[in-house]
Amino acid sequence: MTSIDHALLEGYLVRTRWFGGKGRPFRVTGVRELAELPGDGHGPDVGVYLVTVEYQDAEDGTELYQVPLARYEEIEDRHGHAYVGSVQVDGHERHLYDAVHDRDAMALWLRGFIAAEASGRTDVGGLRFRRVSAGPALDPDLRSSPLTGEQSNSSLRFDDTAIMKLFRKVSPGVNPDIEIHDVLTGAGSEHIAELYGWIETDIDGEVLQLAMLQEFLSTAADGFELATGSVRAALVDPELTVIESGGDFGGEAARLGEALAEVHAALRERFPSERRGQEATTRLARAMAERLDRALPVVPEIEPYAARLRALYDAVAQLDGLEVQRVHGDLHLGQTLRTAHGWRIVDFEGEPGRPFAERAMLDSPWRDVAGMLRSFTYAPGLVEMSLVGRPGEDHQQELRGERAKEWSAIAREHFLHAYTAALEPAGAGSRAGGGAGADAAQNADPVAGADAPAELSPPLRTLVDAYEADKAVYEAIYEKRNRPSWVAIPLVALERIAAG
């Protein structure tokens, strides 16, 4: 077992992309070796460590991070960018590197998955490798490459066969990302990346899930990047309408709405669902109002809309109930991928920072819908903001603003039409928070344009507006603290919602 100095890890954590405590005073208070994967004699062995971080500010709190380290007897210059530090082991110096950036280290994890193919499970060095029966046989010669862009976790691909997400901030218990992907893979869902397996261990009598292996989608494009590209095309010549410019995203939005409806239907069939009474809508409205109260000191610009938002939340409290089920929980365009075979929805971890038990709670599927509607406003808002300030373009800027709103309206309406239309065959009623039936979506033509708004029943319209407002309040707090120049995007949404 390798003993690692806490100060060494503190210096390492602040250099990583995925550490959530950058900018906060913290210290490492514990390091626990969870597992040790033996090498083959030519490469490294790998130690998997659980690092306890305690914060020393007004919020306090403790977090657990997974840190797998490749351990070498000699300095490996080829991995200099992933160097963590050196330690003494039995009088000998060992050099530590972030294992995610080391192909030889990740090959040990790949071997674990291969060994589990026959029985669905194998134990290696303290880690339990699990395989899904439908997964493909894996080639031991697959080469790993870390992916860029991941923030809270680390992802790497094994050539064009599989992608592994390594959870960095971990908690004991079943991770919803693994749980939901396992169920939807078993159901044959076409709108997710198929789950191939996962890695877990036990800690203090509870399961601790560390990584998941999935289908690699070789033709995938990020949904948010696709949307912003569409917006840019629409704003190249703002004298043209969105349809005339070729920047219309309505068809893609409709297909995404259908995909989400099918995922929600599969979750409703395979997990518990129920109807809750008015106490649920009262509790929901209270939570929304409390978030608004917390937001006002941080974002005082919300104040002009606060009274109207409170009235909207009061209307939610008066709804007669809520249909709840398992949902995505943190859905936006960045959690979607467009492939040659359609849309895939990814990252079912839920809202970061919440305990697993809370993320697995039943919720209204309309929360996911509202999250996507917000994303169809964020994409044009971000692009429009990037074009502000060009001298002598006041008229052009005004036109761009109109085209951005037009793009958003088309995408939102197509998405909502398609979502509600796809739910109709399920026969769900139009009660607040439930699946939308014929009376919930009275105009559910998935190819209708922005001039034919989706006519949700009044209770559903109230609920969706409230969820969207609550999401925008959350965004306003985040942007004010992290990207102040972006706070105008959620504020515009709050102005629109407050205006009714």
Predicted regions and their residues:
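Intrinsically disordered, low-complexity terminal tails and inter-domain linkers enriched
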Residues: 41-42, 122, 140, 395-400, ...
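Conserved ATP-binding subdomain of kinase catalytic cores across diverse folds
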Residues: 48, 55-288, 341-342, 353-401, ...
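An alpha-helical support segment within catalytic cores of ATP-dependent transferases
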Residues: 129-142, 291-326
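Active-site catalytic-loop/activation-segment of kinase and kinase-like phosphoryl-transfer enzymes
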Residues: 263, 276-313, 406-423, 477
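Conserved catalytic-loop position in the HRD/HxD motif
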Residues: 330
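Conserved protein kinase catalytic/activation segment
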Residues: 335-345
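Activation of the activation-loop gatekeeper triad in protein kinase-fold domains
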Residues: 347-351
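ATP/Mg2+ or Mg2+-diphosphate-binding catalytic cores
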Residues: 390, 402-432, 438, 446, ...
